[in-house]
Amino acid sequence: MKRKALLVVCLVMLMGLFAAPSLQAEVKFLRMASGPEGGSWYPLGSAMMNIVEEELGISTSNGPGGGVGNCKVVDSGRADLGWSYTHTTYNAYNARGKFEKERKNIRHLMSLYPGVFQIVFPEKSDITSIADLKDKHIVPGKVGFTGTAIAELVLKAYGMTFDSIKKSGGAISYVGYSDSAALMKDGHSKAYMAVTSCPQSTIIDLNFQPGVRFLGIDDKAFQRIKELEPGLMRTEIPVDAYKGLEAPVPTVGTVTNIIINKDVPDDVAYNIVKALYAHWDDLKQVKKKAIEASD
């Protein structure tokens, strides 16, 4: 219901655009930057662009990306639409966090489902807390991923940085989801971090082999994180999200959103939202758990 109410508000706000001459015919191609293979963004991005192409008659493409990087490519015009997170979008627009300059060409188009920060480590590891990662080989995601930026904040709340981990004998591998799984299965990495839909296919795979456990974020660390990044919220990994969990895992989260370049005509933006809303059940067939979380 929350998702439906939000979309109705978005559509009502945009309805006045029909009083102006339509510029949709001038748009010949729309490019979306989504996420890496193995996550929910890439397949959903492809499905969304297929819907837009069919309903609006505009040629489309979908390419890989990350929450931070997508704000930059949409701002520059290299992509017309992109996947990100609400707090990342705010930071990009206002030159906060990972953004060295204001990205004023981006606009929020629509909110989707929650993104949950998750940390897993091998089941047979001697790790018991985030503090134990101080000298380990960890995989926080690629540079440009929002998950990588959140991983830095979480580690900072526990008195660590990527550099301090490397100086203590650990290592950082900036790779995508599939390579992250391979590194842990091969015994090279000791922790995998990502902000994704929950459950996530990479973690389901790792939970099958080699088997994983989850690290939670305590209340004291969460308060430090909120001071560093007010846009993050308190959330948890539900006990029924993964096989073997005995209790919810406290963590931090955000909200997935779609951004759009300000130069995309308003009536095109309106028709994109309208088309996606009309095909919501089709999107559920691509990533049922993620899209249902938006309802």
Segments predicted by a language model, with ranges:
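Bacterial N-terminal signal peptides that target proteins for export
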Residues: 1-9
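Bacterial N-terminal signal peptides
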Residues: 9-17
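Bilobed "Venus flytrap"/periplasmic-binding protein-like clamshell domains
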Residues: 27-61, 115-186
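Acidic, polar ligand-binding/catalytic clefts
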Residues: 79-113, 197-202
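Pocket-lining segment of extracytoplasmic ligand-binding domains
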Residues: 86-88, 96-98, 125, 161-265
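Segments of small-molecule ligand-sensing domains
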Residues: 243-295
